[in-house]
């Protein structure tokens, strides 16, 4: 009974064995037995008799809760004595304690009721007197208990005794709960003791805490023992604030001073392990400590006069700390909870909270239950945070304002959680009056479920209540209950918020919204400052379908991508400054080079230079996720090559859509540019639909031969608004050589130039409206137009380069210089030594090799002020190519001596404005293979004299360069414009239907460009015709085989993709672009223009082959030593190397028979692991590919002609070979074995024959494909296709 008694008197705790009589004297001997039933009072108390027996009255003390004793029920003296003891003790203590009704009273009442169950047979006289005395005391206790019954529990029409007893029972339960909290503290008492805490005596503690209490008269300090829960120390201010004597608190449990509803909050917030240590930041000399920053708990502490029948609770903010206190000198220190209690005043009373600071926030669930309440609401509303948590929001609103909540939540749903202001609402304060508040609302939309997770409210008090003391208890009234309208409104709001949010509004709190308008994220905390929208009276949201949900998920992802893109673009979006200085730039041959336009003044450069940045800002959000991935892949690859950061960014994002390399363009724009020159706009015509071609080719006077450094168009196209396949197809240049080229282009003190834009198609209007190609979304028409433009630009640059190549009579195009070096403007030697690429370092020994006589522009010692003459307007070249200055450089080489160029060169010989950049890459560490018999263009063919067409001025006589080595026949593999052969394959199949119409140009002498020298034109034309006649194969065959080879190599070699893209396209460049403008032939089968069925993407392939073959004509066998110094990838070496190199340089000779034997054994071992097509799969494939049903290869793959020797002999089949029968048993289609029947021709004699052909330089293209594919697979042992691997590497 100790617990209840302690809770009752708040003072000392009587021992279980002690007895008290009404007068305070111990009761006399054993109590008398009762012979008769109890009085009529039992009627009021019998109802509760089963809740507790009288045995509890003298139960033993327990720390957790009072326990029932095991007294015998055969005698009632225990009950009688307990009844008297508890009744009298309560009478003696209730007069001195302002505590709530004592639980001992409840026990006495219950004991009295239980007495009726045990009548006694003793004498009636003594028993009646005792019973009368007990009844009298019981009635007295009930009267006192009824006086302490809170007003809100006094209901009308209810039994006062019943309500009193029910309240007493609640008090008993509260006391038991308190004991459980004491137990929690005691279990954790070891943890604070182990902490490093300072120990204070009571005097020291009083001195330290006085610093707080003296500063704030509404503050007092109290120390509560963690071991006993009793007050160890309390400051003097407590008696003043609580209006009671200080001695009342000594030995009292602190929880007894708290309001019952706040006890749990107090104990839950003061666990010793979670409290800060007092000694860490507060000491006698440390000055005041801002304890308000600590975790505070709000509680109501009992106060008022001792005799006040109704205790008055005052709100306090308690800031807890943990420390050790030594009560006396000899006593051990015990861990204590030091509380700094600060009284909370009404915000409308002095000192008042300023009107502009009367703001607080709330958060409630979709069910309209308070989830969080700002502590600033306490002085404004009179409620402590725990009073509102879990309570219905509508319960505290004015009945007339409750329907507004439904409209508010509808607007939240409509605006997708965006903050918005709403009309004022009236909120009921604790004193019963209403406070008018301006409200702002916002909702948090869960990013995955797309539902409103919770609603945030920001409230600013507009009108204060009439009664400024919001903590005044309201007038007695029945306990509030949820009205039906509150329940109905809550249910409607809950159902409303169960719907997913689908709103076209800008991004809300969850970052979801329209993709095209990524608005700023609004903070609910500042929602009053920003209106989310004015959607008034939103109707109910339309029903949501699963497709809409999926669409919104994609919107979420896309929005994140847009934010990522913008974040990357933002730091580099610096304004473009007018270019001034001595920098020489190429003409911009977008349109016909008009002398009037060229004679413009330099001051116009500033506004023009700003155009790309505007386009970048407008189109920054147009980049697709696939494009970002492509750019990141390029960045990662370049980083692996240890390239300078400027080059990495340059290659990674060269267009206005990209956001990672704007800084390079910025530096270039701010670099020096001489009068009369202008740099290329990086994004004015970045893509066909992105911008319009610039009609002003030149701004200023004459042009200098030094061209700006520009990136390859294939890199530019990475970021254009094209589809994923188109994007990747143009990503053929994620290779270090291009990066080095770009790096070598850099002039001294000048960063790389901006991204060039692809040349528009010849059929495109020269000067469309400024916004004619503004991106309006990725449509098929936009993609087709853009693709055609890039293809035409890519082919046109070869035609123009080819004409210039023929002008130099003293040099055959160097294998890697003329072919690939004609891509960017020249870089002076002072810049080149900064390139640290491994591939470039491998070319340092090639300095003697002359640079290609690329007509683009030659590095010359001519002063910068001496530019080339402006190309006349009579140049026959179609002025449809976007300007791309192309420097001449020695690939991967160090500083190269640049021969002087005459300044009197006629302009017609250098139609530079019509050239678009090409990626010219030279891969490191591998020798170039020997030439093969592929037909190549005559671009590299040394011309005896420059062409002199009637429409051209005399060609310049370029100075003879150092003798260049014989041009090596570039591998057809090296000319792909795609980074992945699989992508090329897809594009090839995609281009088949339109390949016929795509081929638009004739031979080198096509009308698309000026006729080159007769010798230059005749040889490639003758070779093309010869191959066309001899092969009798589909034009796609060569590229198909090459695609397979590229597919294998690209997946294994970091430089594999370097062989693709416009790298090799730089090789061929001249005649190929002129003769195969519409659709160049691919790989080995190089047909004439209209017989080419290859995709336009392969324009660089045949053109480079044609010129490579032409250049090979003048090569001597002794010059092959030089060509092999240039090191190419292994797969390229094997593809085109002759027998000498294959047998002596790379691979040791092996016995063909043993190799074939081993391959067969390995292949048989893998038979069970081979895939099998089920019948359903075969039917499904057959529905798409007819050749699957027929068991034959498509024409694109069914190629067995030997291109080198010109024979069309078919490789004999091997129907009798046991290996083929075994493969047939596997259920494999021909295409699964590396290219069809040829792919399976690894067994028997056919295998040896195929490999002999390859070693002799006359193997079939399909065998070449399979050989290269399987040779690489053989190294990694990752492919079962092994029979020919050994042969081809032998």
Swiss-Prot record:
Alphabetized GO MF terms: chromatin DNA binding; DNA-binding transcription factor binding; E-box binding; kinase binding; RNA polymerase II cis-regulatory region sequence-specific DNA binding; transcription cis-regulatory region binding; transcription corepressor binding; ubiquitin protein ligase binding
Stretch list, region Required for phosphorylation by CSNK1E: 596-815
Cellular component, GO annotation: cytoplasm; cytosol; nucleoplasm; nucleus
Chain residue ranges for the region called Disordered: 1-134, 508-544, 646-698, 749-772, 805-874, 938-977, 996-1037, 1051-1098, 1207-1290
Biased composition (Low complexity): 48-57, 64-115, 517-533, 652-662, 950-961, 1051-1062, 1078-1095
Motif residue range(s): Nuclear export signal 3: 982-989
Predominant cellular place of this UniProt entry's protein: nucleus
Region (CRY binding domain): 1149-1290
Phosphothreonine: residues carrying this PTM: 121
UniProt-annotated stretches for the region Interaction with BTRC: 1-151
Annotated ranges, domain PAS: 208-275, 348-414
Record field: compositional bias (Polar residues): 116-132
InterPro entries: PAS, PAS-like_dom_sf, PAS_fold_3, Per1-3_PAS-A, Period_circadian-like_C, Period_circadian_regulator
Tissues expressed in: Widely expressed. Expressed in hair follicles (at protein level). Found in heart, brain, placenta, lung, liver, skeletal muscle, pancreas, kidney, spleen, thymus, prostate, testis, ovary and small intestine. Highest level in skeletal muscle.
UniProt-listed CDD domains: PAS
Biased composition, class Basic residues, residue ranges: 830-847
Protein's cellular compartments: Nucleus; Cytoplasm
Bias kind Pro residues: ranges: 25-38, 751-769, 860-874
Sorted UniProt keywords: Biological rhythms, Cytoplasm, Nucleus, Phosphoprotein, Repeat, Transcription, Transcription regulation, Ubl conjugation
PANTHER family xrefs: PERIOD CIRCADIAN PROTEIN, PERIOD CIRCADIAN PROTEIN HOMOLOG 1
Subunit structure: Homodimer. Component of the circadian core oscillator, which includes the CRY proteins, CLOCK or NPAS2, BMAL1 or BMAL2, CSNK1D and/or CSNK1E, TIMELESS, and the PER proteins. Interacts directly with TIMELESS, PER2, PER3, CRY1 and CRY2. Interacts with BMAL1 and CLOCK. Interacts with GPRASP1. Interacts (phosphorylated) with BTRC and FBXW11; the interactions trigger proteasomal degradation. Interacts with NONO, WDR5 and SFPQ. Interacts with USP2. Interacts with HNF4A.
Function (record text): Transcriptional repressor which forms a core component of the circadian clock. The circadian clock, an internal time-keeping system, regulates various physiological processes through the generation of approximately 24 hour circadian rhythms in gene expression, which are translated into rhythms in metabolism and behavior. It is derived from the Latin roots 'circa' (about) and 'diem' (day) and acts as an important regulator of a wide array of physiological functions including metabolism, sleep, body temperature, blood pressure, endocrine, immune, cardiovascular, and renal function.
Protein name, as recorded: Period circadian protein homolog 1
Source organism: Homo sapiens (Human)
Gene that encodes it: PER1
